[in-house]
Amino acid sequence: YFLLGLFITAFYSCGEDLTPVGPDIAEITHFRNDGPYLFYENGRLKILEVTKDNALNIREESGLPAGLKLDVYSDDNQLLFQVPINKIENFERPAWEDRTEYAKTFAVSDLHGRFDLFAAILKTGEVINDKYEWIYGSNHLVIDGDIFDRGADVLPILWLIYKLEFEAKAVGGRVTTILGDHEE
């Protein structure tokens, strides 16, 4: 009877007014900084971002221009760093059997969109410098999930991870990202 009671309660609850509360999307006139987002299709690159001037910026390129760098801003419109966009040829996921040993491993988790804390932790651990550049040599950075949720700066974290992956690899280091329950 308990389950039947729950079912009946849930059934009658469905009749409630589910009209969304909050502003109508058509009425929103101020957007926060967002992006850049890259889309690559049929040999064309499309870059979308909402700029600090509250404008939607869409740029298209034929292919991937050599030396392309994009500005990465925080949610409150502070320029954080530039990220070079690298062409990825024949992407292969590293095998779990890879047992490369590193002199040092630095692990961090549960970033929850807090770029400021992520950067402070990496700087304190001497993984990056004040310019958000890899200084951890041929060592290993492990990011153990939960990049998303709560904080407003998820995208800058993702761009920094992308940037650090290439910088680490260039000097024999490695960045490993493991999905957490917020990414699944």
Locations of regions flagged by a protein language model:
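Feature recognizes metal-dependent phosphohydrolase scaffolds
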Residues: 14-184
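Bacterial Sec-dependent N-terminal signal peptides
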Residues: 1-21
